[in-house]
Amino acid sequence: MGAGSSTEQRSPEQPAESDTPSELELSGHGPAAEASGAAGDPADADPATKLPQKNGQLSAVNGVAEQEDVHVQEESQDGQEEEVTVEDVGQRESEDVKEKDRAKEMAASSTVVEDITKDEQEETPEIIEQIPASESNVEEMAQAAESQANDVGFKKVFKFVGFKFTVKKDKNEKSDTVQLLTVKKDEGEGAEASVGAGDHQEPGVETVGESASKESELKQSTEKQEGTLKQAQSSTEIPLQAESGQGTEEEAAKDGEENREKEPTKPLESPTSPVSNETTSSFKKFFTHGWAGWRKKTSFKKPKEDDLETSEKRKEQEAEKVDEEEGEKTEPAPAEEQEPAEGTDQARLSADYEKVELPLEDQVGDLEALSEKCAPLATEVFDEKTEAHQEVVAEVHVSTVEKMTKGQGGAEVEGDVVVEGSGESLPPEKLAETQEVPQEAEPVEELMKTKEVCVSGGDHTQLTDLSPEEKMLPKHPEGIVSEVEMLSSQERIKVQGSPLKKLFSSSGLKKLSGKKQKGKRGGGGGDEEPGEYQHIQTESPESADEQKGESSASSPEEPEEIACLEKGPSEAPQEAEAEEGATSDGEKKREGITPWASFKKMVTPKKRVRRPSESDKEEELDKVKSATLSSTESTASGMQDEVRAVGEEQRSEEPKRRVDTSVSWEALICVGSSKKRARKASSSDDEGGPRTLGGDGHRAEEASKDKEADALPASTQEQDQAHGSSSPEPAGSPSEGEGVSTWESFKRLVTPRKKSKSKLEERAEDSGAEQLASEIEPSREESWVSIKKFIPGRRKKRADGKQEQAAVEDSGPGEINEDDPDVPAVVPLSEYDAVEREKLEAQRAQENVELPQLKGAVYVSEELSKTLVHTVSVAVIDGTRAVTSAEERSPSWISASMTEPLEHAEGVATPPVGEVTEKDITAEATPALAQTLPGGKDAHDDIVTSEVDFTSEAVTAAETTEALRAEELTEASGAEETTDMVSAVSQLSDSPDTTEEATPVQEVEGGMLDTEEQERQTQAVLQAVADKVKEDSQVPATQTLQRAGPKALEKVEEVEEDSEVLATEKEKDVVPEGPVQEAETEHLAQGSETVQATPESLEVPEVTEDVDRATTCQVIKHQQLMEQAVAPESSETLTDSETNGSTPLADSDTPNGTQQDETVDSQDSNAIAAVKQSQVTEEEAAAAQTEGPSTPSSFPAQEEHREKPGRDVLEPTQALAAGAVPILAKAEVGQEGEAGQFDGEKVKDGQCVKELEVPVHTGPNSQKTADLTRDSEVMEVARCQETESNEEQSISPEKREMGTDVEKEETETKTEQASEEHEQETAAPEHEGTHPKPVLTADMPHSERGKALGSLEGSPSLPDQDKADCIEVQVQSSDTPVTQTTEAVKKVEETVATSEMDESLECAGAQSLPAEKLSETGGYGTLQHGEDTVPQGPESQAESIPIIVTPAPESILHSDLQREVSASQKQRSDEDNKPDAGPDAAGKESAAREKILRAEPEILELESKSNKIVQSVIQTAVDQFARTETAPETHASDLQNQVPVMQADSQGAQQMLDKDESDLQVSPQDGTLSAVAQEGLAVSDSSEGMSKASEMITTLAVESASVKESVEKLPLQCKDEKEHAADGPQHQSLAKAEADASGNLTKESPDTNGPKLTEEGDALKEEMNKAQTEEDDLQEPKGDLTES
């Protein structure tokens, strides 16, 4: 007809012309735009600018066509609508444009529908009239309108409707042309009818031109859809159908040019129709008139075609189309022979479906807006012809279907476009059976569109994925006009289309199968008989069944589809009976074969859908929530997705197979396949019966049903619908373990699928689908894995017997792998369980093998591995074992084990892991140390340390690895079993830490006896070691360098001595805690042995230095103690801080994780010691701090922390057991200023424990798991310490004893040194007594203040720094400020300098650790949070209160230097720190340095004094070290160990501070300012600050000035804590220099501490308040900095 021909003519003409005109028209300037000028301009404003343009173009095309050829207008309108959709699709290809196009498409489509409706209404008379005029005008309009229609409208229709045609195109290009014409009939009735008449009648230019234009459109859609092959085929087909090479040439040219031109042209023209139709709401017209317009167009164009012998030819064509459709159905194998092209198409379809899915969802809404966006999309559509064309086809198909449905359904279709449109479209199809070929295609389109609409309402993606191809492919067969060409092409395309149809109509076939088959039968010419339709019904029911399973994923669509299927089948048989009369039985067979082949494809993709079951697994997350519906949906969606992927693969394979096995398929499908299917289904059901747990009967019934279904598609449909209803049951299958009825229902769902799959698979197997079956089976297993995950997990939870049955089922159905697609659906459930079990067992065995390997100690590894093997779930917890054994790998055990590990961790004693680890490690490592200590302490100690560290780390790693591995295994099995498993595993990943933490806690409970024994052994070893350590510590610092390893031994010995003392006092104080403390002591001793190697090197010289300093400082401090009880302690607190810092630095020298662990431990000991000390009277606290400067405890704590790397689980147990580790760390820190901090930490026990968490996170890099463990440990410790804080308040001596050597010493100090504290404060104020008492004096007040500050700052700090560290640090900082205040400000300055270094480190890495925690952690604590809070007692107190604690230390430093300068610089430092908390720590550092320069005179004086004092203190310490070495040696050694570490760490923390120390300790004071600023920097530049601090500390060994650089280096070392081992000597020298600085500060501290102490105490209080305020203000920034 004229429209088609003129459209075609223009299309050829406009290939060159059309670019400009159509583009102009696209812009509204072309002739089409001119034609649409009147209407197009108004339309431009109607839906949207582009929409009006496109609608104007449509209306322009329509207007020209109305003027010239209503047929052309209809085609143009339809094409324009399609083009509008196509253009949108083209833009959709660019996702943003596509989305925009969707909105525009909705507007454009509605407008186009309005235009089409009005145009069709107007064109109804005009079409006939304009048929002659259309040739002339159509030539013009054909260029603009057809280019647009071909590009946009037909592309879209072909992408939706025409895609099927396109698929058929690839089969037969001429048929594609006919199909395109049919599509055009669907889209533009005249086009299809004219092609029908044109191909047969060849109405001159109309048919040729229309067919050529439509063929070009087909070719365009083909090129876009099917690619070069299909293009070539469509080119061949198009000339055949077009009967003119011009059609092909025009198609080729038009494809590139006309499509582009037509798309722009039609958008330009489309505004005309919106003008006409936009009076009515676009959507109303689009849905109401759009569908009616489509049908009207179909009827109009068909009347034209009827005028052009269309009715006869249509009937013939319909019959031929039905035959061709049957041929297509019969030729899914040929179609799959053309699979390569079809595979490409399907690949495109898959990709485009994804793209089209979006359009389908949005098309209804976007159709109106489509025209707006189409214009620019035209080029994109052509550029992305294949994708765009597919998308356009999908979109246009939706639009066309919607329009057709509207035309058919009318207003009712508006309400029920999805259901009524499809349902009503069928009656109109019947009504227009003469026009049913186009109408049929349209109803099919409507059905597809209904599908897509349903898809839009339900699963747009899933159903759209199915429905686009379904729509596209079926529409192509429906649109097939030419008989032979249509038959060949449609057979091919139907092969492709029917697979795609049935693939996508698997869900859509529910709707389309009835309606498409109606269309095929009714629209196909009514030749197809109801029997053929029944085959199709059988095909579609099975497809519907499977896709009910699939669309059960889109269950909302499923009812609609079922309704459509019911409507369609009920109506389709009528049409089929009416129209199928012409269809031959061979066609029925073909259709039967084709439906079965399509169904096979549909079913086969289902098999592969199980591969997308990964997506289903993802969906199974939702499925887990909605197991019944969602699992079915995810399975259906996964199957649909896999139907696409597999459809592509299998289509490539199956087209040939189907071609070869078309008859065999019939036999298989009709006869053998149904019987075989029944047999396979029954056999699989028999075997699957055990699987389905009583599903044998159901499957046997279903097998018989399938047999009957083969004979009776209706019954199959009913069964499929029943399975569709039961398809939710697969979703409910997870709960099917709960009930057999549900499981049976699931079996039913699976069984029909198996039956259909077995049929299809038998066919596929016959056709070589076995390969696909193997692929499909894994995919099924995967898809079913998700279902299995639900089912097996719940099975496991609910019945292991079911799993066993499932295993039996696996063996049975696994044996029946002929139905592998069927079997995998069920088999993978149990098989998966068995496989998972095997995997878990293998993994467990591997863990058993690997864990011992991972574990340094075979003892731990074996026992742990055994325990872990037993409790692969999370950790070696008896409760967890019970949970694991009870629940095994079921998802529930994860939560149960997670819950129980926590519970057990808290309440259950899991001494086996921790104790075994502890015993093995302690007995193994400690005896080795004891044995090897006499020999090469350095080498062996290092070895033992490494062994112990490795063992402890291995234990921790093993435990963590076990927990993680159990998690991983659980995750593996869980991920396989259930998303719940995954979520539980994700929780489990947390639980392992908790479990590890819990394990140590349990260890404490159950391992206390073991701990006592181990502690006794350790004490014996440690005694020897301690003696050697004493000797070594008596050795000069030169030996200390040699004693990098022996230090650890010394520490161990000290720890052992402390452990002995602690054991004695533990026994005295607390028998139950004694074991725990012993266990911790052993851990600490072990940790000391492990960690002490490096600290010892620091320890010996620094101990000497500390003794010297302790002596000097004790003299000074003693005087100061006499003068100021606090001042000595401050200096010693500095020493402790330095000692702690040095030790952690030494520790940090050894391992990063160790330091972190140590930090955690020091934090633990600090928290515990703080609690204990706060519990202890100030004197006790002073004594505990005095003796317990906790140097041993800090070393043990540090050692423990090192040990903790391996013993994170054990450590938590230790920490929980005695809270000793936190107490140790805090006791050590408390040694600095923790007396008050302990008081504050009494309030903060939980916080101190939380600080443990923070320290754990302090070294998150080294030990995240340990950190997590420590976090839970900290939490547990926090809980324990909170409980213990009450206990510790009474037991504080005990717990300090429990803490470690420091705690032991502290306990001794508390008990013995309770009096000794005063003595040592007076007599032994040298290093210990001096520290504690001032610290006690200052700390008790400040501890209260620290409590307030700790609670105040801690709470603010806590948010930033895990709040635990901040609180602890703040508490300590509070205590430390008190100590600082009480201490000589110089000592405070030194402490601040040290603590600033620590703080810098702390800023760098450490969250606001207590000053001593930082000291213990060295830079480590600093590494954690970078909170300036309390690297060292005083400064961290001042600083920790404000996260910019540095200001307070600065004030302290400057209090030493200048209270004015300190106040101003404190504020400056606070300001600097606040900025420094920001990234500019160096700038702040410089500012602090400037402040330091301001104080430089005083700094220089202090520097010289400090240098002199350092030397004198070193000598005095060396002299007094021998004296103090015997009694206070352990304390001194520990103190000095802590001091060196603290010095190293403090110096590391005080990058600037040590630099300032180089200036003097005034510069350290200023350095504190700068260090505080640098702490802020450290926060932002925690790594840099740590490295700088480590570097500076390294240099600090050379010189306090070089300490500046070494502090800078120290942060690096803090970063690389491993480097700290090498830095240990440097730390020793740093400790010496810092001891000198401490001595200087000590000297200074009498001067500064006396006057400035009070002032600074007030100033510190004020500054602490300020700091708290600032810190509260800065906490968030610092927390951010810490995070950053």
Curated annotation (Swiss-Prot):
A lipid is attached at residue 2 (N-myristoyl glycine). It is a lipid-anchor. A motif (AKAP CaM-binding 2) lies at residues 740-760. It is found in: Cytoplasm, Cytoskeleton; Membrane. Residues 253-543 are annotated as: Involved in PKC-binding. Residues 75-86, 321-342 have a biased composition (Acidic residues). One of its GO terms (biological process) is positive regulation of tumor necrosis factor production. The modification Phosphoserine is found at residues 11, 18, 22, 27, 136, 234, 244, 270, 273, 350, 371, 467, 489, 505, 507, 540, 543, 584, 598, 613, 615, 630-631, 634, 637, 682-684, 733, 745, 767, 786, 873, 1059, 1292, 1351, 1355, 1357, 1546, 1645. Pfam families: RII_binding_1, WSK. A motif (AKAP CaM-binding 1) lies at residues 593-613. Residues 89-105, 212-227, 251-266, 302-320, 468-478, 611-625, 641-660, 696-710, 1198-1210, 1239-1254, 1293-1331, 1467-1492, 1653-1684 have a biased composition (Basic and acidic residues). Residues 228-247, 270-281, 714-723, 980-992, 1130-1176 have a biased composition (Polar residues). Keywords: Calmodulin-binding, Cytoplasm, Cytoskeleton, Isopeptide bond, Lipoprotein, Membrane, Myristate, Phosphoprotein, Repeat, Ubl conjugation. The modification Phosphotyrosine is found at residue 353. Residues 30-48, 497-511, 626-637, 724-741 have a biased composition (Low complexity). Binds to dimeric RII-alpha regulatory subunit of PKC. PANTHER family: A-KINASE ANCHOR PROTEIN 12. This is A-kinase anchor protein 12. It comes from Mus musculus (Mouse). The gene is Akap12.
